[in-house]
Amino acid sequence: MLDIDVLRQQGALRLSIAFRAGKGVTALFGRSGAGKTSVISMVAGLSRPDGGRIVVDDRVLFDGAKGIDLAPEKRRVGYVFQEGRLFPHLTVRQNLAFGMNRVPAAERYVGEDDVVDLLGISALLDRRPAKLSGGEKQRVAIGRALLASPRILLMDEPLASLDAQRKDEVLPFIARLPRRFSIPILYVSHAMDEVLRLADTLVLIAEGQVAASGPLEEVLARPDIPDFAAQRDAGAVVAAKVAGRDIPFGATLLDTPAGLLRTRPIDLPLGTKVRVRIAAADISLALERPRMVSVQNILAATILAIGEPEDGRLSVDLDAGPPGGPPCRLWASITARARHDLGLVPGLRVHALIKAMSLLRDELVEHSPH
């Protein structure tokens, strides 16, 4: 558990940051220059707050009022930078050992074999960094940080220097870390795709302040955060459980707050919790439920709000939850002409036709033998 409440004047930017981060991945998201990296730098002890308090697992790392400011090497945090920062003269095996040797043997709870297996780097152990791809370097850097048996793992845009292919290579490994090692992760990014793939908790930072924080699905559903509005086209995220299988038609049934959804076959046990991403561009709206249509997932919904047109398109904020039940927020991106022709207004009941969706973080699950 990370509990942080700090102040820092950084040039013209006044940082006032307070939030709690529990198990799993907590993503710090915001525009460049918002103060995200400054936050993890203060947690690591690389920069000093002007005041406040930082606590990790009940261990006080900084307390301005009590004069506590532990040196970085005494904080037991792992840090993964944008670039791997591996020692070029050492092999991968020796780089990993550097992280492990910083911790007394009695305090180590992460084993080298486990890290090598999880990150898929057994074939790289005798290579030097110059012989590694960008994605391989980042996996080794993650392994070195893990082998320091940290209380928390700090990741400062670790995929920013990688192309899309290398990002896709590394993301599944990061996604598995919290469950495999029970290490909380503080993850800095301004890439929404990464946040949707990894985060359990989202902390939105704007101009040095926490604009919102909480479970990812709840923060994504908030309509009152202007700095976040442009990100909604990335899609809504809906919590779901594997509820059944339609074997003859090759589909898996997912139970969501909005009802059952059909998706591709997935090899996960019944009851497994997953999350579904539904892009705004993949939702069409109808006033009546279509009878003969190829779209398999159709949800009744209420229009909560309609955005202003931009380049001929606008965003429609929907609640697909049951009447009187928990909300299930979705966004649809439609043309201004469609709004006019359908007479769409807030409060109107419509049907949301979901043309596509993607499963998030299914690779997190430890698969049971079948």
From Swiss-Prot:
Residue sites binding ATP per the record: G30, R31, S32, G33, A34, G35, K36, T37
Enzyme nomenclature, EC number: 7.3.2.5
PROSITE patterns linked to this entry: ABC_TRANSPORTER_1, ABC_TRANSPORTER_2, MODC, MOP
Gene Ontology cellular component terms for the protein in this record: plasma membrane
Swiss-Prot/TrEMBL catalytic activity: molybdate(out) + ATP + H2O = molybdate(in) + ADP + phosphate + H(+)
Keyword Transcription in record: no
Keyword tags: ATP-binding, Cell inner membrane, Cell membrane, Membrane, Molybdenum, Nucleotide-binding, Translocase, Transport
Limits of the Mop domain: 292-363
Localization: Cell inner membrane
MF-aspect GO terms: ABC-type molybdate transporter activity; ATP binding; ATP hydrolysis activity
Membrane topology: Peripheral membrane protein
Superkingdom, natural source: Bacteria
Enzyme class: translocase
Principal subcellular localisation of the protein: membrane
ABC transporter domain sequence ranges: 1-232
SMART domains: AAA (SM00382)
InterPro entries per record: AAA+_ATPase, ABC_transporter-like_ATP-bd, ABC_transporter-like_CS, Mo/tungstate-bd_C_term_dom, ModC_ABC_ATP-bd, Molybdenum_import_ModC, Mop_domain, P-loop_NTPase
Alphabetical list of SUPFAM superfamilies matching this protein: MOP-like, P-loop containing nucleoside triphosphate hydrolases
One Pfam family named in its UniProt record: ABC_tran
Function: Part of the ABC transporter complex ModABC involved in molybdenum import. Responsible for energy coupling to the transport system.
Homology family: Belongs to the ABC transporter superfamily. Molybdate importer (TC 3.A.1.8) family.
Binding partners and assembly: The complex is composed of two ATP-binding proteins (ModC), two transmembrane proteins (ModB) and a solute-binding protein (ModA).
PANTHER family assigned to the protein according to its UniProt record, in alphabetical order: ABC TRANSPORTER I FAMILY MEMBER 10
The name this protein goes by in its record: Molybdenum import ATP-binding protein ModC
Native source organism of the sequence: Rhodospirillum rubrum (strain ATCC 11170 / ATH 1.1.1 / DSM 467 / LMG 4362 / NCIMB 8255 / S1)
